[in-house]
Amino acid sequence: MVLIQNFKYKLVSLVLGASAVLFPVTATAAEKIEFNFPPFGQFDIEVEDLQNFVETGEISTELAYYLNRLPPDQIAKLPELLSTPLELDPVSIAKFSNSTIGEAVIKNFGKGIKGDVNQNGFYALRGAIIAAAFDPEGLTVMNLLREFPLSTIYVDLEVIDRYIERGKRLFEYRQAIDTAFFPVESNSNKSQRRFNSEIGPQVLGKYSWQKQTFTYNNPNRSKKGYFDLYQPTIERSVPLIVISHGLASDRQTFAYLAEHLTSHGFAVAVIEHDDINLNKFDNFLSGSERFPEPNNLIDQPLDVKYVLDRLETQINPRLQNKINLQQVGVIGQSFGGYTSLALAGGELIADKEATQCQEENREVLLDLSSLAKCTFNELNRDRLQLADPRIKAAIAINPLGKIFGREGISAIEIPTMIISGTNDLIVPPVAEQIKPFVWLDDDLDKYLVLVKPGTHFSFLQEGLGVLPVPDTVVGPSPTSAYPLLKALSTAFFKVHLAQQPEYRAYLQNDSLQQLDNDAFKSTIIFDLTEAQLQEIIDR
């Protein structure tokens, strides 16, 4: 009896809960949702019963068989769950659905949600997603069901269960990290903080600056690229910091940070990477471009090298004398974070036996590291080393770190800071940042900064980008996180480029926590073993 009750509870949770977790469940003429759960048999839910439940709250006898196995609070929330639209632009959804990654994501869901029991539901799902997105009521689960182009939706519970368990595991990891590194703070401790917002590295520095735009030439690209050079009004030679942006970004994404660092006495070069900028990514979403191309992994770090070469040999000598090109730092976000780690010494090592790269085994979802690693394998290169000896320190924000693996990331030999958002759904923190931090050599001057509830978008310039993501994924206003990034990057490069060790005081928790606000909190970690991390996520 207990077995049957557990089965029924799981059955209802999977079928009804999956609609919310796996929103690509489309439907137009769907009349029923059918699923098989051996050895108990075949079951189905009438779409009309669900629709009536959402509109009136009435539960049919057939639907009651499933709903009565759910807790009352979940039953009460279900109508809203099924009818609340996702806050996504329909044009962006349509573009994404026709893109390389979008197709891969929908094909993965199509393994578990089908129009025919023996066939991937990709085409039916994609058509229903796009049609539902343009419905006046928006992209809701019920609209997806109504737009599904076949009468029956076949659900493979084994596949759906696997996806739900993966999402559940990521959520549990996030909770474990929050509990371990962000303990509940007493009101008395909060009141003891005395934060002077007018001092510290988060405050604009004393130097004014000028900005100029230059071109650079990466011979692997079909056209010249651009970078903005910010220089402080200082006559002596100063260190240079290079900023590398991520997907769907450009030179404006971190302009606020470039201005801040320049005001503290650094020269800053902000590069535009043509292969992943706003225009390129918009084309990718339209389906006219592929991403990631195998050469993206090579060309983006090479962009930085060619910018340094341009500054070293072809810029006005008067400018050259004001920039120390042997004391260079790099800071990058997302794919730019990968670039930072690669230039710092991280090596890409091919995995020719990677079964997840085989088409039938790919479960991409939004695992950009695995997707990028699979494209790297297409290059038929055993190893890729892109370190530049001019670079002496690196910051990687929300990087794709897993792509390097333990051996590749351990090749880094310069001071490195990894900044990770605990709520990053695009590049999950445990796999992509925390484990790579653990893999860095213990003798390295290394830092891991966790930002709660930081997301993949928490440090980006507001209002930029073409990614179709809802506000709940973007998180709190990024402007609330700017002071933290300004303080971290200024202090880090003051210590490791400008040789001003007194700034280490700002790279301690006592100082960082003074920057905590209602939106974001942070903590800095210097040492974490694999055993300690495993203990945290196993709790």
Predicted regions, residues:
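Gly/Ala-rich beta-loop-alpha elbow adjacent to hydrolase catalytic centers
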Residues: G246, G332-S340
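Alpha/beta-hydrolase active-site loop
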Residues: R290-L325, A342, K352-D367, L371-A372, ...
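Mobile cap/lid helix-loop segments that gate and shape the active-site cleft of serine hydrolases
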Residues: D351-F404, I414, N423-L425, Q433
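Cap/lid segment of the alpha/beta-hydrolase catalytic domain
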Residues: A248, Q252-A255, H260, E272-I298, ...
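Active-site-adjacent alpha-helix of alpha/beta-hydrolase-fold enzymes
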Residues: A411-Y482
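N-terminal cap/lid segment of alpha/beta-hydrolase-fold proteins
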Residues: V184-R236
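Mature extracellular/secreted ectodomains of secretory-pathway proteins
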Residues: Q42-E46, V54-R194
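Short beta-strand element of the alpha/beta-hydrolase
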Residues: S237-G246
